């Protein structure tokens, strides 16, 4: 089964080797048929503490690293 990949914004980088990423998705309201923005926060593994608050990054699902961490940051090569 392929690993899920999500894109979001770093909202906290205060922990060692961990960033908190807020991922936003759009869902349709069942009655009013209007699109609503929903967000969820994920703890992601950042091995070298490279990413800072406010940056847009991509995260990939991985094996559990700790109680709350089962995502890792995808480091994309600079173009």
Curated annotation (Swiss-Prot):
Species for this entry: Paramagnetospirillum magneticum (strain ATCC 700264 / AMB-1)
Family: Belongs to the universal ribosomal protein uS17 family.
Subunit text: Part of the 30S ribosomal subunit.
Record-level GO BP terms: translation
Keyword annotations: Ribonucleoprotein, Ribosomal protein, RNA-binding, rRNA-binding
Role description: One of the primary rRNA binding proteins, it binds specifically to the 5'-end of 16S ribosomal RNA.
UniProt protein name: Small ribosomal subunit protein uS17
Entries under Pfam families matching the protein: Ribosomal_S17 (PF00366)
Cellular component terms (Gene Ontology): cytosolic small ribosomal subunit
InterPro entries with a match to the protein in the record: NA-bd_OB-fold, Ribosomal_uS17, Ribosomal_uS17_bact/chlr
GO MF term list: rRNA binding; structural constituent of ribosome
Keyword Transferase on entry: no
């Amino acid at each position: 089964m392929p690993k899920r990949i999500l894109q979001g914004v770093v909202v906290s980088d205060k922990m060692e080797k961990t960033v908190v990423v807020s991922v936003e998705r759009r869902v349709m309201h069942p009655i009013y048929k209007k699109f609503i923005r929903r967000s969820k926060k994920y703890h992601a593994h950042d091995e070298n503490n490279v990413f800072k608050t406010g940056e847009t990054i991509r995260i990939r699902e991985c094996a559990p690293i700790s109680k709350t961490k089962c995502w890792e940051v995808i480091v994309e090569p600079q173009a």
